[in-house]
Structure formats: structure tokens, C-alpha cells
From Swiss-Prot:
Keywords: Bacteriocin transport, Cell inner membrane, Cell membrane, Membrane, Plasmid, Protein transport, Transmembrane, Transmembrane helix, Transport
GO CC entries: plasma membrane
Organism: Escherichia coli
Protein name, as recorded: Colicin V secretion protein CvaA
Gene that encodes the chain: cvaA
Cytoplasmic-side segments: 1-20
Length: 413
């Protein structure tokens, strides 16, 4: 087949122009990779929270809610009752805790009666012994006075007896008169001995009564103390009975009731959520970020991070700025991470240490369409962290560094 057209040959591009373009391109490329920099970045998950955090109150027992003391939106103080939960058990004879409580209350009444009777008996016994002691003390005082006067009389009679002997020696009286006087003196001496013996008996009886008063008082006090100990044990048992019957769930912090999870008549199990309490006055919201161990060394307080909220899509609201406030230097425990809904979950066989980073969003309230949309507890967010900054050529050569490390032998420090 013959060629029917005319071929037109265009003039070629000059060599110098090709060389110039190549030099310009290569120079620009080299300047770009040598002067230009790039920051390695990583995306991490997190959630919005406050300080103090919202409090979740869980049930520690299994039972039925029989009373509700608060309502949603109500301000409460630490220690205020929230729910009354009935955990009692019933048998054919009635409610076990009620029967047990009645038995203990009856025992307490009997113990109180015994203590009252013991105190009354103590008072009567000690009063009786005290009266006897006073009587013997009075008798001892009177007998002591009588003995004193009798001793004075004995001295007088002894002088008279000596005078009679003198008179008899002079012949003024006969021997019978002297004998009568001597007999009278010794008779009075015997009477004095009897009075002295009675006086000593009174003194001994006083000592005995004083000892009995102390002994009886100590004995009654000991018996009363034993009964009081028994009453204390019964009161403790009564408290334990109350614990086995009804449990009052109380608020653990000041705040406002945000939501109630159960209602009156509903059954709850151990670990069930009962209510949530949020702080009354929220000044600032914070962002809890979970950073892997290969990124946390490159983060420091004051760094800027980009935030994208799940509730405010970045396609419509864009990204938001936040500042790193604190960085934990120890991995977060599994128990701590379980308290955050947005925390990453470690899969079996691939446990990764996560570090908690707290950032402060610059915008606490987002304005959109003439409305102000506040941040809320638990909002999920994703953050971009900017890590190490290198020249572009260093990033391009990083695979060769890996080859170098793999080919390097043992290192001798």
C-alpha cells in the first residue's frame, strides 16, 4: 500500500533546553529532599472527660430496688442516699432478717432488764452494807467513849483500893471491908475487859463491812460489765442483720444526677450500673488520649495536636487544636483503661503498652449555625500527634539504616 500523504518533520528540541530543564528539575528535587522536612505523625483514639470525672455508681449487692431518693438533674452531696435495695430472703416462717431482728431485739430487752435489776440490786446491797457500817461505826464510837470513862473510873477505884489497904494497916477498917473493895475493883476490871472486847469486835466488823462494800461493788460492776458486753455483741449482730436486710446506696461525691439506670421494683445484680453523677460546675473539658509506646518518647507537655471529634465530623467542622498537658510515664493498667469507653482494647497475644496523655482543647464550646454546641463527657475523638521531625532525605534513607542495623555485628561498649 503506497503512502498517500506528505510527512512534516518538526524541528527537534534543542539540547541545551533539555539539559537546562533537567538541571532545574534535579536541582529543585535535591533542594526539596535536602532542605524540606517532614514530621512523623500517628493517629490515636481518646475521649472527652472532665476533672473530676463523671462518677458511675454500681450495685455491690443483688436485690430489689424498693425506694428511690433522687431524680435526674437533682443536685446531691456526698453521703446523700440514692437508692434503698432490699436483699432479704423469705421462708415459710416469714422474712428471715425480720425474724432474726425481732429475736435480737427481744434479747436486748431482756439484757437491759437484767442490767437494770443488777444496778438496782447493787444500790440496795451497797446501801444496806453502808447502813450497817454506819451503825457499827456509831456503836464503836459510843463503846470507845464508855471504855475511856470506865478506865478513868478504874483508876479511881484502884486509888480507893490502895487507900483501903492503908486504912486497914492503920486499923481504921477491918479486913472484910478491904476484901470487898478489892473484889469490886477486879469486877470492874473484868467489865472493862468485856467492853474492850466488844469495842474490838465493832472495829473488826467495820473493817469487814468496808471490805464487803468494795467486794460487792466490784462483783456487781463485773456482772453489769459482762451484760453490757453481751448487749454490745447483740447490737453488732443487729447491725449485721440490717446489712442483710436492706442496703442504702449513697452518693460518693458532690454533683448532679445525670442519669438513673434503674427504677423502683427492678431487680439489680452485683456490678449493675445504678446512676451517673457529673460535677456540678464544669470549668474545663479534657481529652484523654491513649498513645502507644513507640510514640510517647517524642511527645512533651505543650505540644500541639489536631483533634477530630466523632460527634463533629471533620468534613463539616474541620479539625480542632489542643495542647498536651500531662503525659504518664508508666503504662496504664488494664483496670484503669476499662473505666474509659474510648480506650483501645488489647487482643489476646498482642498486648501493647498504652500511655495516658491528657490534652486541653482550645475550644470548649463549638459554634455552628448560630448555635453553641458544648463538649460532653465520653465523646469519642481521634487525635493526630506530631512526633519526630527529619529531613526528607533522611526518611528516604531510613530503609538503608534498617539494613545497616541488620548487618551490624555485636556491639562492644
Amino acid at each position: 500500500m503506497k503512502w498517500q500523504g506528505r510527512a512534516i518533520l518538526l524541528p527537534g528540541i534543542p539540547l541545551w533546553l533539555i539539559m537546562l530543564g533537567s538541571i532545574v528539575f534535579i536541582t529543585a528535587f535535591l533542594m526539596f529532599i535536602i532542605v524540606g522536612t517532614y514530621s512523623r505523625r500517628v493517629n490515636v483514639s481518646g475521649e472527652v472527660t472532665t476533672w473530676p470525672r463523671a462518677v458511675n455508681i454500681y450495685s455491690g449487692v443483688q436485690g430489689f430496688v424498693v425506694r428511690q431518693f433522687v431524680h435526674e438533674g437533682q443536685l446531691i452531696k456526698k453521703g446523700d442516699p440514692v437508692y434503698l435495695i432490699d436483699i432479704s430472703k423469705s421462708t415459710r416462717n416469714g422474712i428471715v432478717t425480720d425474724n432474726h431482728r425481732r429475736d435480737i431485739e427481744n434479747q436486748l430487752v431482756r439484757v437491759d432488764n437484767i442490767i437494770s435489776r443488777l444496778e438496782e440490786s447493787k444500790k440496795i446491797t451497797l446501801d444496806t452494807l453502808e447502813k450497817q457500817r454506819l451503825q457499827y461505826t456509831d456503836a464503836f464510837r459510843r463503846s470507845s467513849d464508855i471504855i475511856q470513862r470506865a478506865e478513868e473510873g478504874i483508876k479511881i477505884m484502884k486509888n480507893n483500893m490502895e487507900n483501903y489497904r492503908y486504912y486497914q494497916s492503920k486499923g481504921l477498917i477491918n479486913k472484910d471491908q478491904l476484901t470487898n473493895q478489892v473484889a469490886l475493883y477486879y469486877q470492874q476490871q473484868n467489865n472493862l475487859l468485856s467492853l474492850s472486847g466488844q469495842n474490838e469486835q465493832n472495829a473488826l466488823q467495820i473493817t469487814t463491812l468496808e471490805s464487803q462494800i468494795q467486794t460487792q461493788a466490784a462483783d456487781f460492776d463485773n456482772r453489769i460489765y459482762q451484760m453490757e458486753l453481751q448487749r454490745l455483741e447483740l447490737q453488732k449482730e443487729l447491725v449485721n442483720t440490717d446489712v442483710e436486710g436492706e442496703i442504702i446506696i449513697r452518693a460518693l461525691s458532690d454533683g448532679k444526677v445525670d442519669s438513673l439506670s434503674v427504677t423502683v421494683g427492678q431487680m439489680v445484680n452485683t456490678g449493675d450500673s445504678l446512676l451517673q453523677v457529673i460535677p456540678e460546675n464544669i470549668e474545663n473539658y479534657y481529652l484523654i488520649l491513649w498513645v502507644p509506646n513507640d510514640a510517647v518518647p517524642y511527645i512533651s507537655a505543650g505540644d500541639k495536636v489536631n483533634i477530630r471529634y466523632e460527634a463533629f465530623p471533620s468534613e463539616k467542622f474541620g479539625q480542632f487544636s489542643a495542647t498536651v498537658k500531662t503525659i504518664s510515664r508508666t503504662p496504664a493498667s488494664t483496670q484503669e483503661m476499662l473505666t474509659y469507653k474510648g480506650a483501645p482494647q488489647n487482643t489476646p497475644g498482642a498486648s501493647v503498652p498504652w500511655y495516658k496523655v491528657i490534652a486541653t482543647p482550645e475550644k470548649q464550646i463549638i459554634r455552628y449555625d448560630e448555635k453553641y454546641l458544648p463538649l460532653e463527657n465520653g465523646m469519642k475523638a481521634e487525635s493526630t500527634l506530631f512526633l519526630e521531625k527529619r529531613r526528607i532525605y533522611q526518611w528516604m534513607l531510613s530503609p538503608f539504616y534498617d539494613m545497616k542495623h541488620s548487618a551490624t555485628g555485636p556491639i562492644n561498649d
